Structures are given as structure tokens and as C-alpha cells.
Amino acid sequence: MNATAPIEVLVLYYSRSGHTADLARRVARGVEEVAGCRARLRQVPPVAPVTQTAAPPVPEDGAPYASSDDLRACAGLALGSPTRFGNMAAPLKYFLDSTGAEWASGALAGKPAAVFTSTSTMHGGQESTLLSMMLPLLHHGMYLVGLPYTEPALLRTSGGGSPYGASHVAGSQNTPQLGAEERELAQALGRRVAALAVRLALAGG
């Protein structure tokens, strides 16, 4: 591990109404609470009905769009998406489907990863969405990090958060802000990914 170079954790997300982006920023804050770690916040562009990128190269707001270079350079990954019928949103799936070269080269193998999501309703498919995002990460050979019940907020939350990852219940009007426990759990998830990335780097991968 290079003592002068920070370990970068890629926080990669798709967000339509802004709630998943809010979670991503909290995860990134948790990453940067770990000494020697830095978060790289990136989003994926929307896709058109014909399943191709449907946005200019530079987003109008939010984080820059992700590239394959971001994946190869990261020491850990936190992946976020709103739910779409209990699954990840199409733009994130489209991006992940394009990572065959990284899979073939093992670029992500042996790196820690975590997932986060937001839904409009309490039972709108949070856990199935989190699990759907884990599948490609397992194919990439990543170490999955969740949220254990040693995190006090997981016992207190009446909104988002589960052992599978951080989450947020946005409400049917997409208006509520992240709750206190949701914020706490998102930051805890970022810390856990970053801490494992540091341990793996110190151990030589």
C-alpha cells in the first residue's frame, strides 16, 4: 500500500428523483471517514427505449458519468439504484452489462463491494433490488459487504436499511428526506467498504 496515495472507493449510482443520489453522498461521506480513503462519486446516464445511452457525455448536474477506467482504478465499489419492479433500474443494468472486459480480466476480483437502493413504498422491493445488484458483483469475484445488527441504527430504523445494504423509503410523492437512521446506515455502509479495502490493501490484496 502506497502511504501517500489514498485508497479510492467508487460510489456508482443511477438516480432519477434524487433520493438514490442522496444515499450515494452519504455512503461517500462514510468512505471518507476512514483514514486513507477517498470516495469517487460517479453516476450512469439514462438509457433510451432502444437501450442505448440517451444523454450527452457530461451530465447537467450531479456526479460525472462513470467509465470503465473508474471501475479498474477503484479499490472498492458501492453500487446504488432505485428499484424497478424489485430489480435494479435499466441504466445501471445497461452499464454493468458492458463490463465484460473487466470481468474477463478480473479487474474487480478480490475487491469489496456493497449495494444501496431507494423505493417509494416500504414494501416496494428494496431487498430484492439489493440482491439483484449483488449478482453481477459476485460474477466479478467481489467480496460483498452488508450491514450487521451491530449497527445500532439497524435495530432502530422504521424506514430503510437492512442487512443487505442501505436503503431509503421516499414515499409515494418522492418528497421525504433521508431519515436519521437511513443516513447513519448509509454512512456505516461506506465505512465498512472502505475499512475492508484498507485491510486488503495492507495485506497486499
Residue ranges and their predicted role:
Residues R16-H19, L77, S81, N87, ...:
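Gly/Ser/Thr-rich helix-start
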Residues V44-P49, G141-Q173:
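Mobile beta-alpha loop/short-helix "lid" or hinge segments that flank ligand
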Residues A109-G159:
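Short, glycine-/small-residue-rich phosphate/pyrophosphate-handling segment
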Residues M1-A107, V169-G205:
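N-terminal beta1-alpha1-beta2 submodule of the flavodoxin-like/Rossmannoid cofactor-binding fold
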Residues D97-G100, A104, T121, H139, ...:
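Alpha-helix boundary/capping detector
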Residues L131, P163, A180:
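Glycine-rich phosphate-binding loop at the start of an alpha helix
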